[in-house]
Curated annotation (Swiss-Prot):
Protein name: Leucine--tRNA ligase
Enzyme class: ligase
Compartment(s) where it occurs, according to its Swiss-Prot or TrEMBL record: Cytoplasm
Primary residence: cytoplasm
Presence of keyword Nucleotide-binding: yes
Amino acid sequence: MQDKYSPSEVEQQAQQHWQAQDAYRVTEHARAADGSDKPKFYACSMLPYPSGKLHMGHVRNYTINDVMMRQLRMKGYNVLMPMGWDAFGMPAENAALNNGVAPAAWTYDNIAYMKKQMQSMGLAIDWSREVATCSPDYYKWNQWLFLKMLEKGIAYRKTGTVNWDPIDQTVLANEQVIDGRGWRSGAVVEKREIPMYYLRITDYAQELLSDLDPLGWPERVKLMQQNWIGKSEGVRFAFPHGIPGDDGKVIGDGKLYVFTTRADTIMGVTFCAVAAEHPIAAHAAQGNPALAAFIDECKHGSVMEADMATMEKKGMPTGLTVTHPLTGEAVPVWVGNYVLMTYGDGAVMGVPAHDERDFAFANKYGLAIKQVIDVKGQPFGTEAWQEWYADKERGVLVHSGKYDGLDYRQAVDAVAADLAAQGLGEKKTTWRLRDWGISRQRYWGTPIPLIHCDSCGVVPVPEQDLPVRLPEDLVPDGSGNPLAKDARFLECTCPSCGKPARRETDTMDTFIDSCWYYMRYTCPDGATMVDGRNDYWMPMDQYIGGIEHAILHLLYARFWTKVMRDLGLVKFDEPFTKLLTQGMVLNETYYREDAAGKKQWINPADVDVQTDDRGRPIGATLKADGQPVVIGGVEKMSKSKNNGIDPQALIDQYGADTARLFTMFAAPPEQQLEWSDAGVEGASRFLRRAWNFGVAHAESIRAGHGNGVVNGATDADRALRRELHTVLKQANYDYERLQYNTVVSAAMKMLNALEGAKDAGADARREGLGILLRVLYPVVPHITHVLWQELGYAGAYGGLLDAPWPQVDEGALVQSEIELVLQVNGKVRGSIVVPADADRAAIEAIAAKDEAVHRFAEGKPPKKIIVVPGRLVNVVA
């Protein structure tokens, strides 16, 4: 055993041992020593995109997973920790454009490097289950399930709006549109309607909402999904009109439909707004060039809800009116840039007095504002919006004719009944959730398995011809989809009539790939999409990933699971029983501004920081030139802020165990972790201390493995065992709560106790170090494995990987004596030691005889002795 701790040598030794044993290969129905089935536990981190290198967020995520699985394996569970690659997507195409290399080659090179990095971290991954979503063996089943959904009517085709770059002749993702222009060409982006494929996720809206309740997920994530699904109960009703369309017939059968959750405010309607694509807008624009130009401007705007919420609300009158269904009054119709044709009926009612958006719109354009809700004691005015204007809990109706005096619920019921009686409306439940458009006009993704035939129309690819393989040697040039120009892929034969035909060139949304990869881990070599092994492992016991995936990925995965259930492929309703969303990793930022005032971000490694006598930063300079830089504050590690830490450099300098220890100790898993170079140094020092303690006591520990453990022959033994088992009990509790930062804290207390127990015997010390190594092992597996082997524990207990988790000895926790604070006349004057089972009289007698009592009571006999059990004695003299 080497005297000095060398992380690289220790970690190489441990990893070679695990590799030789194939230590992490897992099978179903593993048996315990007594022949019984081990309970299964499946925990999985969200699979990474193979961007090229791991970042510290990856390190934290996977270490959390690894700690959990190693500890549960020691507790007798059959654990599964797999890994794969979310390998399709736009970044690979962008890299291909920049570097002139095929996305496939770029992706596979990145996978190889990142896999090597993960292995250097010592992660207990079963690599035999590795999955890459760009593999035909994987995406074949994306295609197969799509065809099944097409058969069932869950998948369907309709036109959808996309961002079109007229110069590059390609569709752009929303994030590729910057200030209304294409990110590469700079061209003004157009909106185009093209045929696309959709999945009916809305058919599952109520189930997706209801099934959130029992999940062991953070309430914040549940709320985000609830809001995204967006169940609204209200009234859908019509404003009658006689506006004709191009064919001379009345548009929409003479009814402009809207939906509202505030039917109680219907008497306050002073305008209606329609989407730019609405037939009424198109009709009004025919003789109105200004309106036509405004509509064209709206069509070039974003269709993202987030953008709609923050952009300036604009409108223009159509000169047309519709009829209020209850008053018969004429209501002007406007075109509004904030109204989406894809949401509801493409029209909204405007009630400026009781909707903040409508209030601002009406004030901007001089529209009428009519109060119809009143809250007692609150004056109404049109100059500035007040929160109570929208209060449906305290408000009652005014200026509303027969509805005056009704509260919210009464008014909604009455209005809905009157509208229904006229055949103009009814109560309805609507959903914010929209069907999932999965068509992407991109190359690097799962090909949609359809064929276009001039004679037969759209024809599904026969099941036996799956997968439709994506050519992996194409290099995008930025002008359109490469698949549409590749004859090898495009040209085919119609499976129905045998005539020449063309393949569909759209590929699937990459969220499809991440919908079910965790099930493929259970049966990666399966001849079917999933098999009986999936029934064993699923549903997953613990899912781990970032809060940024709280909505789309998790929602789509839940939907996909329910579709698979309905197709008879799985037997469960929800894929993830518990969810842990780990906090972001933060670091300081530094920058200088260039001549144009643009910030040039500088990596923290290139900066010297000056601090005051309390360690607080007071300035910073660039190492290269010694000149000042601006301290920008603490932010999430990112490429854009250039404040990332390279995990590989950290591992090369300090070792993987130090990286793991710091990321677990610095903060609870669900909270943000602020990077600290001093914290990394501290983690490294702690591991050196643990190693040095093992070296110092190696001989006595190796010699004592045949001895049994007793409750200690001396007071020092008993004190050490009491401390260790007390801390072990707390560590067990913290492991169960996934509070790994306090687990590390417990291990530090154990080492402190061992180092401080100079008078303890070898047996107590041997037992104590054995407990410490097992408690610490899930966090820092390399150093603990080598110490376990070198100090002879493996011979006594077996390898650390499957060593039994240490049991708390309740007998060791029992104290024969306790220390009580001693007060004289209410002031602390020392302490006394009494038997743990001493009664009040015995404690009083011991206190009365104490020398401190005699000294501070000046020889006076006690008038009264107050005993607070387990805490203190107060002698009143």
